[in-house]
Design a protein with these regions (language model features):
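N-terminal maturation segment of proteins
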Residues: 1-201
């Protein structure tokens, strides 16, 4: 699947961004039935700026509480022709964008009943826990109908489980860098460069 041309259909960065917008539009009607409160903060999908794209991962930047700056889901696209659709595009959108980080952070900032340290402070366990939970809502939100996208979501889950094993291996069992890289490469479809990046992050 990593090399099959059917999974790299894009020619331009705009086509990749349009694919994410299609995910957004597909799940939006379902989100409205699941959430009775949605953020006032607007939302955009943008390509990561060229100056930082090589070292960036897909990420969410929070909007401003007063709504003057939108929340932005950034997607690094170095070469659209190699952008693989099986990498869990739908699960990534659910995690980083809606209802993941965009809903959680925006609603938290907009809640004037919360003390400021709770409105603007980050609790990473909660932030990431919510985003991971949102990935599990794919089917309820009209996504994961393509078996390859669902497989991508399961692959993301496996990757996180492997990260936990490697973390314990390195910090408790004394694994070397090479042992950690080898474990990742033997238990998931990750390149050596990808495994090195994970170990050294």
């Amino acid at each position: 699947m990593k090399t099959d041309k059917q999974f790299t259909p894009y020619k331009t960065p705009k086509e990749v961004l349009d694919a994410y917008e299609k995910i957004h539009q597909t799940m939006l009607p379902h989100v409205k039935t699941m959430f009775n409160r949605v953020p006032k903060t607007s939302f955009e999908i943008r390509q990561t700026e060229a100056f930082r794209a090589e070292s960036a991962s897909a990420e969410y930047f929070a909007g401003s509480p007063d709504g003057t700056r939108p929340g932005v889901f950034y997607v690094p696209i170095l070469d659209a022709t190699t952008f693989n659709t099986t990498g869990g595009m739908e699960s990534l959108f659910l995690h980083e964008a809606i209802p993941g980080h965009h809903y959680q952070i925006s609603l938290q900032q907009e809640d004037t009943l919360l003390p400021k340290f709770m409105r603007y402070g980050g609790n990473n366990a909660y932030v990431e826990g919510w985003a991971l939970y949102c990935e599990s809502l794919g089917k309820e939100l009209g996504l994961y109908t393509d078996p390859y996208q669902y497989m991508g979501a399961l692959g993301d889950e496996m990757h996180r489980a492997i990260r936990l094993v490697v973390d314990v291996g390195m910090h408790w069992k004394g694994w070397t860098r090479e042992e950690a890289i080898a474990y990742m490469m033997s238990n998931e479809p990750i390149s050596e460069d990808g495994a090195v990046a994970e170990i050294e992050r």
